[in-house]
Structures are given as C-alpha cells and as structure tokens.
Amino acid sequence: MATYTHFGKQPDVLKHLILCEVLRNEHPQVYVETNSACAIYPMQQTSEQQYGIYYFLEKAVEEDNQVLKDSIYYKIESAEMQKGYYLGSPALAMEVLGRQAQKFLFFDIEKSALDNVERYAKQAELQTSVHLYLSLIHI
C-alpha cells in the first residue's frame, strides 16, 4: 500500500468533510467508490498531515468553529485519531451510513487496499453489505 500516501493531507480532509456531510444528509441506499484505497491507516504524523488532519482537529475545537466541531466528520475522525488511526473514505462511508445502506461497492487496483476495507467491514459488522472489486488496468 505504498502508493497510498495521500491520507490525512489537506485535500483528503476536505474531501472527507464534504463526503460525510453529503452522506449524512442524503442517505443513499447504494454507496459506490471507484478508487477506494484503504478504510483505515495508522497515523505517521508527517508534515503534510500536520497541515491536514491535525490542523483540522486543532481548529475544530476552537470557540468560533462550532460548525466544524459539530460535523459528523469531526466526531468520527477525532475518536479514531485518539487511537492512532485515520479513517479513509470507505470506513467513513460505513460509519455514516451503517445499515441504512443496502450495499457498499468498493473498487481499487490494489488487492491489499481491498483486504483492508474487508477487514474494516467485518469489524463494523457490515461484511454482508460490502462488495469488493479488483480493477484491472489495461494500457
């Protein structure tokens, strides 16, 4: 999974913040992710993550940022970060939608990423709703 170094960086945090709010409001029956990557990552505290997820968590608890602190993303990610882990979009989708969704379809080009998603789905007791697809690249 060496190719997945984007987690916890600024663009990833913004994407996840928006994703969680959309899922919370829309409640889709089927969730599809074409480039899923992993569900959960051990944190590494890189400088990019310092300006990404760590900065977000720090600023969310400030007095004038109640909207961020009240976000579903903050609630989910801050709890996981206290354990030393960062949730990717597959885990966030499973956490926000839970059993409300009938199916989760995850596609990726790396089997190890899909194995990671599968382990998280079992932990969340959603394995019967989660379907994994290894994408093949043709040049």
PLM segments and residue spans:
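Class I SAM-dependent methyltransferase Rossmann-like catalytic core
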Residues: 1-25
